[in-house]
């Protein structure tokens, strides 16, 4: 019996890419591939790329350049580029880096087995179509092997919002929701493999409207169906748009015990002028009122957000509006970035903010966000939380997991196991984690 072929996947970017990489590995598993953590040992290398940040494509080309020596030493090595850079660049990747054998977009990776076979026949393989067929239906069921206690599950892809800074509608396409029965089937398969927490993924996940037994189902309806699965203890979802935060979803945060008290709800800016230029279709005031309604339903919920500073035409007054919004919301987590020009997006054509000024604003914003994060984490000391333990910590006998609020918690107890959920009393707060002891 011949040795299995080895597959090395490097994943960039969002949680959806992590999910996609898992499914690509499973698809190629049927071709005799097993995963390796070493590119040097691989028979196939796949870069699953992200196109959100500035110079994303150039970073991919630079990474590919590092494989030239490896390809020369192993002529049978196959190198592929997947994900959103593959979708955006297409055939240009092969032109600039002839060592690449395969380019596949995020809507076509269910075709990887036939594309891989094409490369083994000595041909180049390119597929960046938006096929009519459902890629999830074409993918086989999840393997039965045991896995960790948490998992991502994509329920929705694409976006119809067309924010002025974003390439997602161009690389992931229009909003598409998976039928509820297929999601529930996959969730059950994951639970059978030991998963106790599932995070539902979508570029605009709360716009979910997948087919259900009685017509389209909302995200809240899907969450309630997942709530019925024995063995599934926790549900999360990300990423959401404020305009799609429906009443039934807000209500679910207050009534569904398995839905964790954590919500990532990006706002991007606190200035109505900038929000309009971003094509966000909401105001700072409407966002703040939405936060009030969510907290009325679940008072202990921890909010998370995204911010872009230095957006074209942003003034100091606009930036102060963003700081004011952050002070009012007090995020437990927030991701902040300096605006980077994305060719092909409307914002790229507008007057740009001085880079030094944008850098200064980013530092000031991050200082406020960090202060709030530390205050919220310090406020956990003395409280009891529920922790799902995921893996051993750095110290002997230590286990690390996540609280319901997504805080990393480490506990010194040799009797704990991955997948166990326990009540923990928080005794100390650090920069990035909490220390606790079994309650």
From Swiss-Prot:
Known EC number? 2.8.4.3
Looking up SMART domains in the UniProt record yields: Elp3 (SM00729)
Gene Ontology molecular function, alphabetical: 4 iron, 4 sulfur cluster binding; metal ion binding; N6-isopentenyladenosine methylthiotransferase activity
Name its co-factor(s): [4Fe-4S] cluster
TRAM domain: residues covered:
378-439
The record's listing under InterPro entries reads: Elp3/MiaA/NifB-like_rSAM, Methylthiotransferase, Methylthiotransferase_CS, Methylthiotransferase_N, Methylthiotransferase_N_sf, MiaB_methiolase, rSAM, rSAM_horseshoe
The record's GO CC annotations read: cytosol
Q: Where in the cell is it found?
A: Cytoplasm
Task: Report the catalytic activity.
Answer: N(6)-dimethylallyladenosine(37) in tRNA + (sulfur carrier)-SH + AH2 + 2 S-adenosyl-L-methionine = 2-methylsulfanyl-N(6)-dimethylallyladenosine(37) in tRNA + (sulfur carrier)-H + 5'-deoxyadenosine + L-methionine + A + S-adenosyl-L-homocysteine + 2 H(+)
Task: List each copy of the MTTase N-terminal domain by range.
Answer: 5-121
Pfam families per the record?
Answer: Radical_SAM, TRAM, UPF0004
Q: Which residues bind [4Fe-4S] cluster 2?
A: 159, 163, 166
Main site of residence? Answer: cytoplasm
* Annotated function: Catalyzes the methylthiolation of N6-(dimethylallyl)adenosine (i(6)A), leading to the formation of 2-methylthio-N6-(dimethylallyl)adenosine (ms(2)i(6)A) at position 37 in tRNAs that read codons beginning with uridine.
What PANTHER family has UniProt attached to this entry?
A: CDK5 REGULATORY SUBUNIT-ASSOCIATED PROTEIN 1, MITOCHONDRIAL TRNA METHYLTHIOTRANSFERASE CDK5RAP1
Q: Which HAMAP family did the record assign?
A: tRNA_metthiotr_MiaB
UniProt name for this protein: tRNA-2-methylthio-N(6)-dimethylallyladenosine synthase
Which species is listed as the source?
Answer: Ruegeria pomeroyi (strain ATCC 700808 / DSM 15171 / DSS-3)
